[in-house]
Amino acid sequence: MAELGPLCVGIDPSPALLGRFELPDSPDGLRAFCEICIEALSGVVAVVKPQVAFFERHGAAGLAAFERVVAVARDAGMLVIADAKRGDIASSAEAYADAWFRGPLAADALTASPYVGVDALLPMVLAARATGRGLIVVVTSSNPEGREVQGAVLCDGSTVEQAILGRIGQWNAEELAAPAGPGRAGLGRAGPGRAGPGGAGPGPALGSVGAVVGATGGTPPQGLGELGGVVLAPGLGAQGATVSDVARRFSGCPPRSVLPAASRGLLSCGPEGLHAAAGRLRDELAAVLP
């Protein structure tokens, strides 16, 4: 990522985008779509984010296509974030940890929802640490409907999103204060020769737990700069956020900790325009983010 910059491209094989690529809405169409996207993005971006819901539409064959996109992206030297937003309690959380960090669905990081309780995610946090992967928790989503819950004020005067950020910060501080263990150096804790998501270089060491904080909206949640983990920032392009919004909203974050994400706005360029469009956006982001 030190060479290719911070842009993360979402791979969302919706029926509309499959049609734009002149592909069938089928498992074969999913596989072809993903392979075309990865070929176009290879050497342009370092991180891709397949949206799992579009693969689940096709059942077991769709999940097999998801496994294929993870393998193809890794062969191309990319990191993969599985955008599945999983979250549950007790044994169910353990099962998600097994499926998404130790099983055949495992990518380099998984998105998670904290709304059954932040500490209910602990089995996935521990699995991320143990396997050298990342868990990226939804804190402030890019859709306006999220404000009703995420911006709600708690009895101590803080908001829900601030409370979630604070807990993530505690997890990362504990992890970074402990001796480094074995694991795969991905979007989680920095491994040999890496300095968090930015690769080798001046970026800080980052913990295994990151936050989803949308690039849309005004002032970012208080405490974001002390997160100690990756910030995944969706909403660039089709949802209305601009490169200038990203620069302003995340100016207080450490170098190489922010991953702005664009999906539909780039994919709608089609197979003939994706490579060039992603390259332009990557360069614009690299010019404004440390």
Describe the residue ranges of each PLM region.
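Conserved N-terminal beta1-alpha1 strand-loop-helix module at the mouth
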Residues: M1-R68, V72-I81, H275-A286
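Acidic (Asp/Glu)-rich catalytic clusters
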Residues: A2, I38-V44, V70-D75, V125-T131, ...
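Short, well-ordered coil/turn segments that N-cap beta-strands
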Residues: E3-L7, G43-A46, A76-M78, A106-D108, ...
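Conserved, mostly hydrophobic/aromatic
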Residues: V9, V48, D83, L110, ...
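Conserved anion-binding
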Residues: P13-A16, A84, D88-R184, G198-G210, ...
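Active-site-adjacent beta->alpha loops and helix N-cap segments on the catalytic face
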Residues: R57-V72, I89-E94, V116-R129, T216-L224, ...
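A C-terminal functional module that forms or caps the active site or interfaces directly
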Residues: A211, A215-A261
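C-terminal helical cap(s) of enzyme catalytic domains, especially alpha/beta-barrels
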Residues: V246-C253, S257, S268-P290
